[in-house]
């Protein structure tokens, strides 16, 4: 990338992440940009974002909120990842940090006393340590994974990575509309789960003041091709299906297909303790619950001070670096498992409406082309919703029983502790 991505992605900062930010002196800045709780405390399950609700989950009234308040002076916040990252970049602007854009690592040499990173322009960077935070298919991460326990070998880093099967294909759409923001001020929410004849999708209200939203809708290969689903004409059709009336000022900012995976690297570090995996390079998980970015922050916080001590020549520096994988891998494993469970809980709502995911799998077989698939699924949605005289009843039961996707997770957020070779959620 030649510049940071402005595409909205993660948007929930947990209490633990905010505690870390407070320690770094970023607490006041985050509180200034955070929207009020009233705007994002709810999840709405609806036929249109500006239409009728099947049910509303008010997480601000959930027992978990009180548990978090009792455990920490920090509160969960709803802040878009690009906004959070911009704040972090400003915080290090005056530090001894050099940021380069438009460069890619193509090879890494691993040795007992350091690392050498070769860039795509031919330049070589020598360093004591390598932190591979370049995502699940990054070159630096590939080297760490491919090198396994033999850190002395110089392994090309481009073609080495562990793939995991996709749980689901999606298209993510960033769009702006002050018209939509005005319609939603009387019915605010963080997430709008939309179920109607034209679409089954989720809308994230990132910023009502600026009219910034993110739409996530599923794609079902081979009946649908992700690239075609992200094409402008189809994206506009999906956005149009969200509202009762067309938006007067719709602006599509960006659209990109992506794969939802659940993956955990076998190793987070090499035995030489010269190279480490952090964030998505080490683990991928469904966005359900918002653990991806927060787990990455926990990784970075755990590793940063240990690297500082080791680089300064601390006598126990090697032992500290060895503890990174021992502490963070079990923590990440727990969050991956919870995120998968949350994703499955989220499927209870369409099932309550008579739209089980299995029906879409069958539709892929019955309608192997994109046009036929859309026709088949639209007809199925219409038939199911028409048959359900009171479609909200099943959804209300799921929400009233708190079986839907939660927003707060006190045990996983603040209850995690490191205990020797394991990490677990404290009661």
Task: Put a short name on every predicted segment.
Residues 6-93, 194-197, 206, 336:
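Active-site-adjacent segment of FAD-dependent monooxygenases/related oxidoreductases
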Residues 308-426:
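C-terminal helical "tail/cap" subdomain of flavin- and related membrane-associated enzymes
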Residues 31, 98-100, 251-253:
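General small-molecule cofactor/ligand-binding pocket signal
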Residues 120-129, 271:
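Core beta-strand elements of the Rossmann-like FAD/NAD(P) dinucleotide-binding domain
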């Amino acid at each position: 990338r030649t510049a940071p991505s402005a595409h909205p992605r993660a948007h929930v900062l947990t209490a633990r992440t905010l505690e870390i930010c407070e320690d770094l002196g970023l607490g006041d800045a985050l509180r200034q940009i955070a929207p009020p709780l009233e705007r994002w405390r709810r999840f709405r399950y609806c036929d249109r974002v500006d239409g009728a609700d099947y049910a509303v989950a008010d997480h601000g009234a959930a027992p978990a909120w009180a548990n978090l308040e009792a455990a920490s002076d920090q509160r969960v916040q709803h802040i878009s990842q690009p906004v959070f990252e911009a704040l972090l970049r400003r915080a290090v602007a005056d530090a001894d940090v050099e940021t380069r854009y438009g460069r890619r690592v193509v090879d890494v040499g691993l040795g007992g006393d350091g690392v050498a990173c070769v860039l795509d322009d031919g330049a070589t960077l020598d360093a004591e340590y390598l932190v591979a935070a370049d995502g699940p298919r990054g070159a630096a991460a590939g080297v760490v994974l491919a090198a396994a326990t033999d850190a002395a070998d110089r392994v090309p880093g481009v073609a080495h990575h562990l793939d995991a099967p996709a749980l689901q294909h999606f298209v993510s759409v960033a769009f702006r509309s002050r018209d939509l923001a005005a319609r939603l001020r009387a019915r605010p929410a963080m997430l709008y789960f939309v179920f109607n004849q034209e679409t089954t999708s989720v809308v994230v209200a990132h910023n009502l003041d600026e009219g910034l939203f993110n739409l996530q809708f599923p794609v079902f290969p081979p009946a649908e091709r992700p690239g075609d689903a992200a094409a402008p004409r189809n994206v506009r059709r999906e956005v149009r299906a969200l509202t009762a009336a067309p938006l007067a000022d719709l602006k599509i900012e960006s659209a990109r297909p992506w794969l939802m995976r659940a993956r955990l690297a076998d190793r987070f570090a090499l035995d030489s303790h010269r190279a480490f995996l952090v964030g998505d390079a080490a683990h991928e998980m469904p966005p359900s619950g918002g653990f991806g970015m927060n787990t990455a922050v926990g990784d970075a916080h755990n590793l940063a001070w240990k690297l500082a001590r080791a680089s300064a020549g601390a006598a126990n520096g090697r032992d500290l670096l060895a503890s990174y994988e021992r502490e963070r891998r079990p923590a990440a494993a727990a969050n991956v498992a919870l995120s998968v469970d949350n994703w499955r809980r989220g499927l209870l709502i369409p099932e309550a409406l008579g739209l089980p995911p299995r029906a879409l799998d069958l539709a892929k077989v019955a309608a192997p082309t994109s046009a036929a698939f859309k026709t088949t699924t639209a007809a199925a949605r219409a038939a199911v919703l028409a048959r359900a005289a009171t479609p909200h009843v099943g959804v209300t039961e799921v929400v009233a029983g708190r079986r839907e996707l939660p927003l707060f997770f006190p045990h996983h957020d603040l209850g995690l502790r490191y205990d020797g070779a394991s990490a677990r959620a404290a009661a």
